[in-house]
């Protein structure tokens, strides 16, 4: 079995779309022996601090044990602790340390961003001639081109180090403050500006590459791939998904479209030397949670459960085990193992920091902040007393 981790995961912080709690996601990933997990909520990073704190707590005992082993290693090497067979003891301790380090669970901080088709500041009402829907038939299914500024293309963006985390925060924040139009959006100009320390995956059928493929714009898809490769280099991956619906009341159109996209992505991967990864676009934890998630989608779209025309998911979007993902992608094992390559690229880093307190200038005649505070405290106290 190829080792695997999930890189495309939505929690309850993907508001009215994700149904999974962060503790449940992390607990299942750890139980299954996964070495890490990414959190990529839609357009936001609301859950990142909870995710960080939870994983930090779960890793606490193991990290303390590693520190204890390291202290013994240093003591033996320096001669502070004498042992009968120094080399044998050090080798044993190094082995113990390696086993402990292998137990550390790595959080990957990310976001499934929306990338504007033009600039993030473009928010005009779309002209009628552009707004008119164009339909393309692909493998018997209708693919629609939407309004030019509507929502944006999906893109999975992961921070591989602290610099990347800061850049991701900038991109997401700017998407809300400057790029919001139906959704918080970034654009390619911003991605190029803040690309350092980021890993990017091409996302689901809502991504630019899949959409271009499904509308017959193969040249445009290839040009977009080469743009991302030029900016992100070895940190750009083409993302495969396979959601074959197995129950009647589910979206059965998605899987054939994914297969069309996957075939092209594999072709582009070989042609341009871009690595593949597989994901499951996780929205809930267990298979049996699909019905609860279905009802959540009814709430978010304002539709009745028995509406024949309402939005449906494939009901395959649970946090699948490594074995389940191996069964689905057995023909492309590199797409499984490359998820571990991304995990190895991601550094351990802390997003904790001390409180950021405001700084107020103190008039020179008061000297110190303490003297300034004392003067006004006494004055206000006196006023209260009289």
State the predicted function of each range.
Residues 1-386:
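Phosphodiester-processing cores and adjacent nucleic acid-binding clamps
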């Amino acid at each position: 079995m190829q080792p695997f981790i999930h890189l495309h995961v939505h929690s309850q912080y993907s508001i009215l779309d994700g149904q999974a709690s962060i503790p449940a996601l992390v607990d299942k990933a750890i139980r299954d022996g996964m070495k890490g997990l990414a959190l990529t909520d839609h357009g936001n990073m609301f859950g990142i601090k909870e995710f960080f704190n939870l994983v930090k707590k779960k890793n606490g005992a193991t990290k303390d044990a590693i520190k204890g082993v390291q202290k013994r290693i240093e003591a033996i090497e320096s001669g502070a602790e004498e042992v009968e067979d120094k080399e044998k003891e050090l080798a044993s301790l190094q082995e113990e340390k390696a086993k402990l380090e292998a137990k550390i669970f790595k959080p990957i901080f990310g976001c499934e961003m929306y990338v504007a088709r033009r600039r993030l500041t473009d928010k005009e009402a779309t002209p009628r001639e552009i707004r008119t829907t164009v339909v393309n038939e692909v493998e018997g299914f209708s693919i629609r081109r939407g309004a030019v500024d509507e929502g944006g293309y999906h893109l999975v963006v992961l921070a591989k180090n602290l610099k990347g985390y800061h850049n991701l925060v900038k991109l997401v924040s700017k998407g809300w403050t400057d790029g919001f139009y139906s959704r918080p959006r970034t654009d390619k100009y911003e991605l190029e500006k803040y690309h350092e320390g980021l890993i990017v995956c091409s996302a689901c059928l809502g991504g630019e590459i899949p959409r271009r493929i499904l509308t017959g714009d193969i040249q445009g898809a290839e040009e977009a791939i080469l743009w991302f490769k030029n900016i992100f280099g070895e940190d750009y991956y083409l993302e495969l998904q396979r959601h074959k619906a197995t129950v009647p009341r589910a979206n059965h159109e998605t899987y054939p479209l994914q297969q069309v996209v996957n075939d092209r992505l594999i072709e582009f991967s070989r042609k341009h030397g871009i690595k593949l990864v597989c994901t499951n676009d996780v929205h809930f934890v267990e298979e049996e949670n699909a019905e609860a998630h279905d009802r959540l989608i009814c709430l978010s779209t304002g539709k009745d459960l028995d509406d024949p025309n309402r939005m449906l998911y494939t009901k395959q979007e649970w946090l699948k085990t490594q074995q389940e993902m191996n069964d689905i992608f057995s023909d492309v094992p590199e797409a499984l193992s490359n998820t571990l390559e991304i995990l190895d690229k991601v550094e351990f880093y802390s997003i904790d920091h001390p409180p950021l307190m405001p700084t107020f200038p103190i008039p020179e005649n008061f000297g110190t902040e303490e003297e300034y505070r004392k003067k006004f405290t006494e004055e206000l106290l006196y006023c209260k007393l009289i």
